[in-house]
Structures are given as C-alpha cells and as structure tokens.
Swiss-Prot record:
Catalytic activity: tRNA(n+1) + phosphate = tRNA(n) + a ribonucleoside 5'-diphosphate
Protein name: Ribonuclease PH
Quaternary organization: Homohexameric ring arranged as a trimer of dimers.
Transmembrane segments: none
Family, as annotated: Belongs to the RNase PH family.
PROSITE patterns: RIBONUCLEASE_PH
Top-rank lineage group of the source organism: Bacteria
The keyword rRNA processing appears for this protein: yes
Function: Phosphorolytic 3'-5' exoribonuclease that plays an important role in tRNA 3'-end maturation. Removes nucleotide residues following the 3'-CCA terminus of tRNAs; can also add nucleotides to the ends of RNA molecules by using nucleoside diphosphates as substrates, but this may not be physiologically important. Probably plays a role in initiation of 16S rRNA degradation (leading to ribosome degradation) during starvation.
MF term (GO), any: tRNA nucleotidyltransferase activity
Length: 237
C-alpha cells in the first residue's frame, strides 16, 4: 500500500492554471498534489552572444525553491553566493526539454526565459516544473501570435515529465516525498506529446533494478505523461 493510498498507476491530483501572473507574457501555477510550482515565461529581445545574427531564437530556464518550500527553512542560494549543483542540473534539464519541441527559427532572434519557482515541495519538483513550463511557454507563444510577432507554428509538440519508482517492490507512478525517500529505485521521464523520449534519469537507491523493471517504469511514465498532456491541452485551449 502506498502512503497516499493511491493505485500504482495513479497520479496525484494535478492542476495547471494558466495566466496567473499579470506581468509575464506566459505563466502557469502547476500543482502535483502538495508540490506547487509557479512558472513564468518572459519574452526578451536579446540573445546569448554566440547566437546573434543566426536568425533563430533561444529558450532557457532557471529554477529555484523558496526557503520554506520544505519542512525546514533552506538558505537562499543568492545569500550563499552560488547555485547548488542540483539547481544547475534541474534548470538545464528544463531548458533542454523545452528546446526539443520549439521551432527556434520561427521564434526569430528573441529569447524566452522560463522561471520555475517552487512554492511547496513534496517530491517531483523537476517533473512538475517541466510540465508547467510547457504551459507557460505555450501561453507566451500565444501572446506573441496575438500580436503578429510570429507566424509559423512555433511549438511542434507538448512536453511533460513524471517520476516513477519501485516502492515496496512495486513499480509506482508519480512519487511524493514519503515514497521517494523510501523507494528502492526512482526515475524521471521526460517525453513529448506523441510519446517520444527526451530524457530518462534512473537511479538504484538500495539495490540494482532489472531491464524488465525499467520497462515497467517506462510504461507507467508513458501512461502518466499522456494524462498530463491532456491536462496541458485543456489549460491552453
């Protein structure tokens, strides 16, 4: 039995609320159970120096957690003077996941910066961030379309992410913190709307896992991501 009493293939309650920030070109408040992330997408008429003059744009991401997003206060990374390795890893993952599904040439010489701020953490902050980031990005692209700033189809597909793991010997979908901290294996899957794989991160925490177990986790992830993509489409409709 899972601590949350969910079925092995059951997501936490998920909501994707678009357009929650007044000033941002795109925004989304994403909730995976008790994990809440505020995502904004900002359009900027600037590019990294190495991209200037190439006729295409860029999408990048930043990630951070509020000090009391967790059970005990975490020191702000700004006050420490540097980002943690975990933060750098996650924001790079978010950025490259989004870049796989956007037509950078259609974007023009502009940059969209996606900021993911974790308001409350209960496991799966990176997967919630990626799923909400697509909604914020789509919101920003629609803002641009309404102003005739882009003509071609900028977004080629959806992108969403979910965690899976082996808990008490059973493959389960969408781990919360209680499960993640006790799982024998945990993995994160990032996929497109049509089921193609962008990234797989898998780790054996207590004992190695088999190929069959990995495939079982992937099957759960595909099922969960299909549901998330449906929710994304409803959010931006």
């Amino acid at each position: 039995m899972r601590p949350s009493r969910r079925a092995p293939d059951e997501l936490r309650p998920v909501t994707l609320e678009r357009g929650v920030v007044k000033y941002a070109e795109g925004s989304c408040l994403v909730k995976f159970g008790d994990t809440h992330v505020l995502v904004t997408a900002t359009l900027e008429d600037r590019l990294p120096p190495w991209l200037k003059g190439q006729g295409r744009g860029w999408v990048t991401a930043e990630y951070g957690m509020l000090p009391r997003a967790t059970s005990e206060r975490t020191r702000r990374e700004a006050s420490a003077g540097k980002q943690s390795g975990r933060t750098v890893e996650i924001q790079r993952l978010i950025g490259r996941s989004l870049r796989t599904i956007i037509n950078l040439e259609a974007l023009g010489e502009r940059q969209i910066t996606v900021d993911c701020d974790v308001l409350q953490a209960d496991g799966g902050t990176r997967t919630a961030s990626i799923t909400g980031a697509w909604v914020a990005l789509a919101d920003c692209v629609n803002w641009m379309k309404a102003r005739n700033m882009v003509k071609a189809n900028v977004l080629r597909d959806n992108v969403a992410a979910i965690s899976c793991g082996i808990y008490n010997g059973t493959p389960v979908l969408d781990l919360d913190y209680a499960e993640d901290s006790e799982a024998q294996t945990d993995a994160n899957f990032v996929m497109t709307g049509d089921g193609r794989i962008i990234e797989v991160q898998g780790t054996a925490e207590r004992e190695p896992f088999t190929q069959d177990e990995l495939l079982a986790l992937m099957a759960l992830a595909q099922k969960g991501i299909a549901r998330l993509v449906d929710l994304q489409k409803l959010a931006v409709a």
